[in-house]
Amino acid sequence: NPKSLKKNKLRPHKNDYWCIPKKDDAEFIACMEDVLDVYELPYNPERPVVCMDEKPYQLLGDARKPLPMRPGDNQKTDSEYVRNGTCSIFAFVDPLGGTHHVSVREQRTAFDWAEEIKYLVDVMYPDAEKVILVMDNLNTHKTASLYKRYPADEARRIIKRLEIHYTPKHGSWLDIAEIELNVMTRQCLSR
């Protein structure tokens, strides 16, 4: 009966997704508290805190040219699109130093991650004693990736410049770089 269908505040077509850890997950709590302790550190240019994340992104093109916009009208774009491949977006955020660095690569491999980390320590922070790095525990985010990409002495040199802290499983939202990538996607890339 249409009269019984009243407008309500339920929105089953909308979803907010959260990674909710199991209650009393000791490993989650330990990793979370470690990351939060890192975030409480005062700014120190000799030991900058840098958050790192990466995300895949689908490159799409228009199948047909969008119609010209008119004042007061929305842009009219065809719902059909052309796939132009994918890429990986790497982001480094130094929340206290105010530095943001984003790079785009064709893929996400152990070599790609290792090259980004070398850039971080050698180009972005060449004078820092150590870079305190916060990131998720993705399979390529391991010091072994540096050994896969570089000779052992070079990999070791890079590792000695890092102090790594991993966000907990189901807690990557604690990584400021992930938040920044999500904002960039919503405000820039998805437009």
Q: What is the meaning of each model-derived region?
A:
Residues 128-141:
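Acidic/histidine-rich, metal-coordinating catalytic segments
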Residues 100, 169, 177-191:
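Active-site proximal helix-loop segment of RNase H-like, two-metal nucleases, encompassing DDE(D)
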Residues 60-62, 142-148:
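A short acidic (Asp/Glu
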Residues 31-118:
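Extended, low-complexity cationic-aromatic segments
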Residues 75-81, 154-176, 191:
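RNase H-like polynucleotidyl transferase catalytic core
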Residues 56-57, 96-97, 138-141, 170-173:
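Conserved nucleotide-binding/hydrolysis micro-motifs of P-loop NTPases
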Residues 1-22, 48, 54-58:
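Conserved short alpha-helical interface segments
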Residues 1, 51-53, 92, 98, ...:
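Mobile genetic element proteins and their domesticated derivatives, centered on retroelements
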